[in-house]
Amino acid sequence: MTSQPMRDQVEDHLLTPKNSALLIIDYQPPQVSSIVSMDHRTLVANIVAVARLAKLYALPIVLSTVNVKASGSPPTIHQLTEVLAGIEELDRTTINAWEDEEFVTAVKATGRKKLIMTALWTEACLSFPALDALREGYEVYPVVDAVVGRGAWHWRPL
């Protein structure tokens, strides 16, 4: 039996370390503490595991916060920043990360069209940029074990 030829990791239709990027949006203390659809410790463990895997596979990572500079909201939870040491947090003032020029520029700079997307909350901070990215020709893959909303209905957009 002959093996199939090695797949091109950049052009492959499946996710590979060479064709995908991880987007982490708004994992800040107020957002984490407001969720009711998942245990907080489970959520934090899951997003940290996703970040560790992304680092292990050398995926480009875009890390974003909302209103840290504008209104003094706390930055990304320390459990994530410890794993993502050296990755700059891009702070925005809009709910939809895709409406922030610096965020979109960072995503485009990865050169990847497959976006593994995580965000708090599903119903806004995940859904809005995911829909905009899809409209611009990106493929979006939400990590359902690391995204949550403010209510049990957060699963509907997924």
Predicted regions and their residues:
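Short, catalytically relevant binding-site loops at active-site mouths
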Residues: 68-70, 95-98, 122-124, 148-149
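Short, well-ordered alpha-helices that flank and scaffold nucleotide-derived cofactor binding pockets
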Residues: 82, 105, 131, 135
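Glycine-rich phosphate-binding loop at the start of an alpha helix
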Residues: 48, 74, 101, 123-127
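Glycine-rich oxoanion-binding loops at beta->alpha junctions
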Residues: 89-111
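A contiguous pocket-lining binding segment that forms or flanks enzyme active sites
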Residues: 113-158
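Short coil/turn segments at beta-strand junctions that form active-site/ligand-binding loops
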Residues: 19, 59, 111-114, 138
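Active-site acidic carboxylates
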Residues: 1-94, 142, 156-157
